[in-house]
């Protein structure tokens, strides 16, 4: 396994619309394993392939259990996802490994139902609510070249751009 480099905003790579996965082979399995290792090392709960430079329609989500630990056997590997149903509405404070240090409230569906394939190309259906539903929507957005900051109001977006400039200035002076 290997740690992969996470691509940060404003890289144009993050705006790429990812392509459908067609080969469910050892290379894909290695990519999923490397993505999981990278996500855990970065203290994230979700990671889309495009965030590590792979323009493929796949993502992983590994929510921590009540003890705060993310167990590998709980990791969802979601490939070629499609929304079947969505419902409700909720606000959730989101962050992103590609936009480090910035968190903001985003409106999302409260419940989602998706169809996807696992690493063995088996078709699965998943119903999710609350945090898992939010994470699924956030990561699928990445597959479509959309970031959570794109969903902010104009006022919140200006706040984000200002904070980003300040952060970039600090990093230049280090």
From Swiss-Prot:
It catalyses: N-terminal N-formyl-L-methionyl-[peptide] + H2O = N-terminal L-methionyl-[peptide] + formate. Fe cation binds at residues 96, 138, 142. The active site is at 139. SUPFAM superfamilies: Peptide deformylase. GO terms for biological process: co-translational protein modification; translation. Keywords: Hydrolase, Iron, Metal-binding, Protein biosynthesis. Its EC number is 3.5.1.88. The keyword Ion transport does not apply. The keyword Nucleotidyltransferase does not apply. Binds 1 Fe(2+) ion. Its cofactor is Fe(2+). Pfam families: Pep_deformylase (PF01327). It is an enzyme of class 3 (hydrolase). InterPro entries: Peptide_deformylase, Peptide_deformylase_sf. It comes from the Bacteria. GO terms for molecular function: metal ion binding; peptide deformylase activity. NCBIfam families: pept_deformyl, PRK00150.1-3. HAMAP family: Pep_deformylase (MF_00163). Removes the formyl group from the N-terminal Met of newly synthesized proteins. Requires at least a dipeptide for an efficient rate of reaction. N-terminal L-methionine is a prerequisite for activity but the enzyme has broad specificity at other positions. Belongs to the polypeptide deformylase family. This is Peptide deformylase. It comes from Helicobacter pylori (strain G27).
């Amino acid at each position: 396994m290997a740690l992969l480099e996470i691509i940060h905003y404003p890289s144009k790579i993050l705006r790429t619309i990812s392509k459908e996965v067609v080969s469910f082979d050892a290379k894909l399995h290695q990519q999923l394993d490397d993505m999981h290792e990278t996500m855990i090392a970065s203290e994230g709960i979700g990671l889309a392939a495009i965030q590590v430079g792979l323009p493929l329609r796949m993502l992983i989500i590994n929510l921590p259990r009540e003890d705060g630990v993310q167990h590998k056997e709980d990791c969802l590997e979601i490939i070629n996802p499609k929304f079947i149903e969505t419902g409700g509405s909720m606000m959730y404070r989101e962050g992103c490994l590609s936009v480090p240090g910035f968190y903001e409230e985003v409106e999302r569906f409260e419940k989602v139902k998706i169809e996807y394939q696992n690493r063995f190309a088996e078709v699965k259906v998943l119903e999710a609510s609350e945090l898992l539903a939010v994470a699924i929507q956030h990561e699928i957005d990445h597959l479509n070249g959309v970031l959570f900051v794109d969903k902010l109001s104009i006022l919140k977006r200006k706040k984000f751009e200002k904070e980003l400039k300040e952060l970039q200035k600090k990093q230049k002076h280090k």
